[in-house]
UniProtKB/Swiss-Prot annotation:
The active site is at residue 111. Residues 15-167 form the Tyrosine-protein phosphatase domain. Keywords: Hydrolase, Protein phosphatase. Belongs to the protein-tyrosine phosphatase family. This is Putative tyrosine phosphatase 197R. Pfam families: PTP-SAK. Its EC number is 3.1.3.48. The keyword Hydrolase applies. GO terms for molecular function: protein tyrosine phosphatase activity. It is an enzyme of class 3 (hydrolase). It comes from Invertebrate iridescent virus 6 (IIV-6).
Amino acid sequence: MDELMGKTCSYFYPRPTLGSLSDKKALFGGYPTQEQVYLLESIGVEWFVDLTLGNEKRTTPYIIQNKEKYITFPIMDQRVPENIIEFVKFINKLVNIISGLTDCEKLYIHCKGGHGRSGLIAATLLCVMDEISPEKAIKETTLSHPQTKAQCNFLHYLFGSQNINNDSLLSPYSHHQVIIVCGKTETVFKSASDAVYYLLHNSSGKSDYFIRCVEFVLDNKFQQHPSCKQQLLQTGFRQLQCRLGQNCIGTICIKLRNKYYNNLEV
């Protein structure tokens, strides 16, 4: 193991400052030789995540015991992912895999040199799984694996905040018709806000009805207008902020975004 740790790869989850070495589930680093693959498998690595383009210089394809546990997500060297939606789906898949690892199983993420691309993925996973800031995640992962400025900026963007104004495609006030079906009656509203007002006006007045009503209407809006739903998914892991109603709209949008991502095929 000394041949790998500190040279070719490092543990990143749980974080090095938390738990014992036996608790570690995920590693990241450089493109492994076949001999290093055998060594990684001997310490419990079952999943291999390859971030290279597949034809990069000075890389030789390797063989693992279970081909079904080999995952690829190509990112150009020193670059960032081009498609945020596909990237979030990929990260969610890794989160599910890591969360389901048994005590003796591990996952290894690698690029070519074991610096920028694999470090970016490791830092993103820490932000999601440990709910830490990009600054802290970068600090945890760049000591041995420095990332490029563009990759650090991408991480800050991915977990930044975004305001929802009245003209936003995410807002109930945008000019997008919404069709609401209540029983056998189908009603067309000029906007989601009109639909919310109508439903509230005809409600029984329960305390939590407003939140449920806004969520119901926005869900209908996003499902009926793919461009709005696409815009929501493009926000990645960003915090959504709206001044109205103690940010209930932002909270609802994040909830719906998570729901849509869970329903997407990975």
